[in-house]
């Protein structure tokens, strides 16, 4: 309902790269900056019944992942979305497991997946959802494991996020999945902002300005999605993630919530 209400509200103001840069300087020093700013939030969440159950599931799944080989780059037709999603799930789960447990094995396995993905020749920009989800994975791992990464890994992951994630998004438009693609690009831009501030600010402003028409098309007038509930869930998950990242890193969602 709240998403659908956006269509009835006054249009959110446009964001400029200059404003994004100012907000970043005021709010986003240090890591983590994606989704939360203090890992103690995780400890607080474990005190609830839901948080305790989720912690058990995360640690269980991460324990199994320790024995898995890294994910191979394998095409299915013209896409590798299952590869990107697998990597996203592994890196996110392993990074959270490390922060919950302090067990370095989880972090090391996440970094191994990141090195492997960074070595892919590309992230398949012909099917840009693949790029978006893989960029989100790499950004999350980079941000949440930043203090454990040596300088070589930091540079490797920064370069991969920019060259295989963000820069291809400025090519000839071949996709219309605004919520998913801009969530991935925003994650990458926020995570490695200092590496290329001008590109990062432009990328984030572009995402903020793209989202209102996409949300209107997706949820107006009653919250239903024209392509059905599965795509509603898919787009909405990334829509919410994008707003959460803007709020945690920049201190505002630009009136989009």
Which residues does each PLM region occupy?
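Sec-dependent signal peptide recognition
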Residues: 1-2
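Bacterial Sec-dependent signal peptides at the C-terminal "C-region" and cleavage site
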Residues: 6-18
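Short acidic, Pro/Gly- and aromatic-enriched capping/linker segments at domain boundaries
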Residues: 15-32
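Aromatic-lined, polymer-binding surfaces characteristic
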Residues: 25, 33, 39, 46-47, ...
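Aromatic-rich surface patch/π-platform used for binding flat ligands and interfaces
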Residues: 64
